[in-house]
UniProtKB/Swiss-Prot annotation:
GO terms for molecular function: structural constituent of ribosome. Keywords: Ribonucleoprotein, Ribosomal protein. This is Large ribosomal subunit protein bL33. One of its GO terms (cellular component) is cytosolic large ribosomal subunit. The keyword Mitochondrion does not apply. PROSITE patterns: RIBOSOMAL_L33 (PS00582). Belongs to the bacterial ribosomal protein bL33 family. The keyword Ribonucleoprotein applies. It comes from the Bacteria. It holds the Pfam family Ribosomal_L33. It comes from Shewanella amazonensis (strain ATCC BAA-1098 / SB2B). NCBIfam families: PRK00595.1, rpmG_bact. InterPro entries: Ribosomal_bL33, Ribosomal_bL33_CS, Ribosomal_bL33_sf, Ribosomal_zn-bd.
Length: 57
């Protein structure tokens, strides 16, 4: 039997400081349909900045 396709989708979190740094994660599209914004550490500038969701190419 084939497995059902999951609700989780892989996303990329890109730094708003324009350093080029990003994190990859996944999120449940059903529970969180809006774009994710989260404050995380950017090691390039050594500060906490807002990371915004982008599609993985």
């Amino acid at each position: 039997m084939a497995k059902a396709k999951g609700n989780r989708e892989k996303i990329k979190l890109v730094s708003s400081a324009k350093t080029g740094h990003f994190y990859t994660t996944d999120k449940n599209k059903r529970n969180m349909p809006e774009k994710m914004e989260i404050k995380k550490f950017d090691p390039v500038i050594r500060q906490h900045v807002i990371y915004k969701e982008a599609k993985i190419k």
